[in-house]
Amino acid sequence: YKYELQSSKKIKYKISRYRWYSFLKMQKKVAPNIKRIITPSISSKKGIVNEFKCNKNNITVINNGLDTNEFAPIENFSRNKHRIITTASADVPLKGLDYSLKALKMLKKDFPKIHLIVIGNIKKNGHTERLIKKLSLEEDVTFKSNLTKHQIKELYASSSVAIVSSLYEGFGYPVIEAMSCEIPLIATNVSAIPELTSNYARLIEPKNEEMIFNSVKEIFLDYPKHIEVARKGREHVIKNFNWIKITEEYEKIISKTIEEFNNANF
């Protein structure tokens, strides 16, 4: 909630977020009394402890899982040499799309044919559309929505670099989806993201189009090196975020909770 408020200076947006998160008052009362909480990242665990005043010993971290067969590289699928891909809901400042767009403008000088694919919607006459016009990027950005998982996989397979420029992520599915599809990844070094990427992505500071620009350029100019990192990144995702591992962790904690409940004195 507080990260969304910090991400935008617009009063109207802040009011809408305040109304949306009004249920948090109830959660703050209930959460400290819950004996077992499961959350998908260490970062979100810290947030629950700090914001909801919960006992850290009552909180278990179990990552979200991913079907790594659905999100996988496609053999003999040609990559567009200078295509970038990102996932962002337009006009949601927390996703940091502005900084990717500003970096794209800078990159056009060195890579005139560069193109950005955004998986998400664009709001008619909204902030993002206005920024694209201001930067003269109308022909260089394409928004795609209502896609199947296979279509998303094809977009990753046909792109050369993925960017996650979020200002906050409680988990961050676009991170592990991109890594599972074996595409070089640039991601912000915030909240849960570095937990997911380990050493298999180029981490940058948030709100920094200069770092996005430099990172994309570096990957373009030494692609074989970074595609090898991406291959190791997929192995990392398969090992740590496969559904068999995740369901076993859930089974273990649920069984433990049931056992503690049966042994409790009421």
Model regions: which residues?
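Short alpha-helical donor nucleotide-sugar binding micro-motif in glycosyltransferases
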Residues: 146, 154-159
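Acceptor-binding helix/loop patch of EC 2.4 sugar-transfer enzymes
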Residues: 1-28
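Carbohydrate-associated surface elements
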Residues: 43, 65
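Aromatic "clamp/platform" in nucleotide-sugar-dependent glycosyltransferases that forms part
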Residues: 167
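Nucleotide-activated donor-binding/catalytic signature segment of Leloir-type glycosyltransferases, i.e.
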Residues: 128-150
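Conserved donor-binding/catalytic core segment of Leloir-type glycosyltransferases
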Residues: 77-95, 101-104
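Conserved acidic donor-binding segment of nucleotide-sugar-dependent glycosyltransferases
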Residues: 202-209, 218-223
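Short hydrophobic beta-strand element within catalytic cores of glycosyltransferases
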Residues: 184-187
